[in-house]
Amino acid sequence: MANGLNIGSLKIDDSQRPAGPNTTGRAAYIPPHLRGSVARPPMGLDGSGPAQAVPGLNASTWAPNNAGPHPGAGHNWANAQNFTPRDRPPGAPAGPPSMNGNTTWGNAPPRQFNANDYGKPGPNSFRGSSYGGGRSGGTRGIGGHGYWDENGKHAQGPENKRLERELFGEADDPTKQHTGINFSNYDSIPVEASGHDVPESITAFTNPPLHEHLLSNIVLARYTVPTPVQKYSIPIVMGGRDLMACAQTGSGKTGGFLFPILSQSLHTRGPEAEAARGLGRQQKAYPTALILGPTRELVSQIYDEARKFCYRTALHPRVVYGGAEMGNQLRQLDQGCNVLVATPGRLVDMMERGRISLAHIQYLVLDEADRMLDMGFEPQIRRIVQGSDMPDKHMRQTLMFSATFPPDIQKLAEEFLKDHIFLSVGRVGSTSENITQRIVECESDKDKDSALLDILCSDSTGLTLVFVETKRQADMLSDFLLDHRLPATAIHGDRTQRERERALELFRTGRCPILVATAVAARGLDIPNVTHVINYDLPNEIDDYVHRIGRTGRAGNTGISTAFFSRSKNFKIARSLVDLLKDANQEVPDFLEKLGRQGNYYGSSGGGRGGRGGGRGRGGSSSTRDIRRTGGGYGGGGMGGSRPAYGGGYGDSGAGGPYGYGGGSGGYGGGYGGGYGGGGYGNPSGPTGPSSWW
């Protein structure tokens, strides 16, 4: 009936163009104003007449009927006048003839789209190229990326000078850290490694041999010899052992875990990502190495280091952290991920979204592990390590690095480690002798402001990092400095990630040489050329002080640390501060020495080595010692003087006995004339004191 339908002069038969020889089924609908007209070729873009076919495309079905190139453009992008062809890397297959005229950009032929293959890894001929299904994330052998050849051996990609300058900088680049005048003194730093069958330390990066492609990047980074922590950690990790490494700040801990992990990863190709099934399904990343850090700034810094040493390799480091746009991070993961650097919160979020699987993890690294395992992060760490598909500790290597490992954190960390080696590098207290430490007594904020202005106005060289306790104080102090025409900026947890990154960039480049920060910037940040650290507000824990001042005096460079000490607010760390200064051969002010003795007398100092009382301290020097050998506890013992300090606390046994209440050397305060002492039941407390069940 429809075929005979006639509405006025319009027939439905006229609305259908007959099917052509290359079409199937019903042909296209013809609007009324074009019915009965003769088909003509389309006009050119300038309206001057029929479009001409593009040279080189005459064999296509659409070229004769489509417009030519846009005025001013080359015939196609590969043959344009401003196009510079790139050479194909050795061993890479040639592209199809249509792509190999004057350029070799096409390293593999395009595939037909199949909705059911979305997200799957490509076949061998596509892997390592932009056509491969998501693993390598870049064109094969182009842009500073390597690839895996058909035999599964790693092939180094070509040089990319622009990327090289971005990653490694120039020889005199002020934004990059270079070794200082005291770097050679690192060889004299004492090292203690405990555990059975500890591998011998190395003296050069080539023994045991790191992968040659990693070594070339180490040379570009101008690293000549390994630091003490690297001399021990590289053979330990390459030997398959778990590690807890305690090393002074600025001693190369990041390289201590990155170098062996990347070297091992370059010897053996990791597993491919699981294929996503069905149209629109999202690909899941399967990293083989996971590095966790407590702050966004620290993981960003580790990621930058990983990018540097993955240059011209097929390894792809990625970073995920909160406060940044998630979409971009997900797109980066879709391009492939071998090494994942993350903060715990964002990682858990992405795991719950099904975008990251930890099933193939071979290496788990906790940087600044003492903070990662404290009460704030412990639930998230357990969710990641014990509540996911991550292999258990017997099927992976676990590495922990920090400047301090208090005894309670060491006990907790043993849940995640297997038969680990404890590495202690540096002096007791974990501060560097490269740092000159000064303590200034300031009771009020007005006194601190005056002293701060005197310091900043008299020393205008290098970068100055000022630590305060609260976010509000950070903003107020930076405004105060700006009012006095001093270029300052602030960084703290209430600032957006973009603002924090901007502040760090201004500080790193020296355009704003004074940075006021809360503890968010204290842990692990490696900012080159920081010459002065000022503790406007001292922290409550001596371990936090160690981490703060470690932002200067890095990689053998010298630095200055100034702390404003308030008797009313900082009295409880006086004893620990005195011991720390003495251990680092620093001058101890008279007022602080007197306060330290008072702290011993009343047992108010927060834990330490034998000579300190205190409540629930952290064992003093045992923060850098293996509790399996030295013992330790929450108090660390008492004063051992003429009056009892009643310090100490519940702790592990020391070397002197199996059940000591004091841990280390010292028990409940030392008592009268040396009594009530001893590290364990029945051990004498001193040369004249009798045995005591205390």
Swiss-Prot record:
A motif (DEAD box) lies at residues 367-370. A motif (Q motif) lies at residues 203-231. InterPro entries: DEAD/DEAH_box_helicase_dom, Ded1/Dbp1_DEADc, Helicase_ATP-bd, Helicase_C-like, P-loop_NTPase, RNA-helicase_DEAD-box_CS, RNA_helicase_DEAD_Q_motif. Residues 1-158, 602-640 are annotated as: Disordered. It is an enzyme of class 3 (hydrolase). ATP-binding RNA helicase involved in translation initiation. Remodels RNA in response to ADP and ATP concentrations by facilitating disruption, but also formation of RNA duplexes. The Q motif is unique to and characteristic of the DEAD box family of RNA helicases and controls ATP binding and hydrolysis. It is found in: Cytoplasm. The keyword Hydrolase applies. Residues 434-596 form the Helicase C-terminal domain. Belongs to the DEAD box helicase family. DDX3/DED1 subfamily. The keyword Chloroplast does not apply. Residues 234-423 form the Helicase ATP-binding domain. PANTHER family: ATP-DEPENDENT RNA HELICASE DBP3 (PTHR47958). Residues 130-146, 604-620, 630-640 have a biased composition (Gly residues). It comes from Ajellomyces capsulatus (strain NAm1 / WU24). It holds the Pfam family DEAD. ATP binds at residues 247-254. The lineage of its organism: Eukaryota, Fungi, Dikarya, Ascomycota, Pezizomycotina. It comes from the Eukaryota. Its EC number is 3.6.4.13. This is ATP-dependent RNA helicase DED1. GO terms for cellular component: cytoplasm. It catalyses: ATP + H2O = ADP + phosphate + H(+).
